[in-house]
Amino acid sequence: MYTIEINFKSYSMFHPCVASFESAKNLAENYATFSGAGAVVVKNDRTGKIEYTIEQ
């Protein structure tokens, strides 16, 4: 499972429980288009490691 964290200027949003890395990556790319979104991070829940990052 993967969790996506979307960082805005003054707060963060989370999208937990994404089943596959491919789905998480696609969702992260969509979230990166949100107005005001800064960094979007995909984290592997099992290992705790960051698997994918988009910084703007």
Q: Where are these predicted regions, by residue range?
A:
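Short aromatic-glycine-(Arg/Gly/Cys) micro-motifs in beta-strand/loop hairpins
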Residues: 1-14, 41-44
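Surface-exposed loop/edge segments in extracytoplasmic proteins
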Residues: 11-17, 48-53
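Aromatic-residue detector
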Residues: 3, 11, 27, 53-54
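Intrinsic disorder/low-complexity segments, especially N-terminal tails and targeting/processing regions
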Residues: 6-8, 20, 52, 56
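A short, charged, amphipathic alpha-helix used as a generic interaction element across diverse proteins
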Residues: 18-40
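Short, mixed-charge low-complexity intrinsically disordered segments
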Residues: 33-56
